């Protein structure tokens, strides 16, 4: 009897690792995952790790969508669980998405792989992710700031972000942050205006009387991030591209500095208008 059961499991495991293009195979229940982590490096390398709890039943782990390479699955002892197909196997859905089926195990399982999902555009790297459970996105130390669904986040001493309860996200970050520092000097006061963009910037100007900052962007569809002191130019703000009002995102970097983020669809003159500005000094 035991020999027959072993034969059924062994044959089933052999079938499981064969790609199936027209059927979806789910064995047992969804796995209980202790950790779901995606790590993004400055060079665009995407590394994913799942830590799966032990179970006395077969369980299935859905992998992230995309082109997967360097897939390994080991137990807590570091033993290869793919060996002989007796402990784990791969299943494919009709769209080619991969899942890992883990057979009953008294140890936690660790799944690791790389995703070929980064889309490079000059110096800006983009990845779109989606998962049905809470997962973390960790960034290498060289990455200073990211865009999460078009919202800018300065990492500073934070390692990354967590998407609670899962969901989809568009992540963007620079492989080499392109900073332009413009100094505004007014009498004895000096203010730095920092512009982060892959676009060439010309004709930067600060006008105290009109409470505005202006500059020329020379490329279309490029993210432009402006960081400046609220003391220099306070909000609320209006931003124009060649006299046409455009959308922008605003956040605070810290207590004193605001961040404005835009993406002009065409090249032209950007004008940022505030409602408050440093007072004029008497001559």
Per-region residue spans from a language model:
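Short, hydrophobic alpha-helical membrane anchors of single-pass surface/secreted proteins
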Residues: 5-7, 278-283
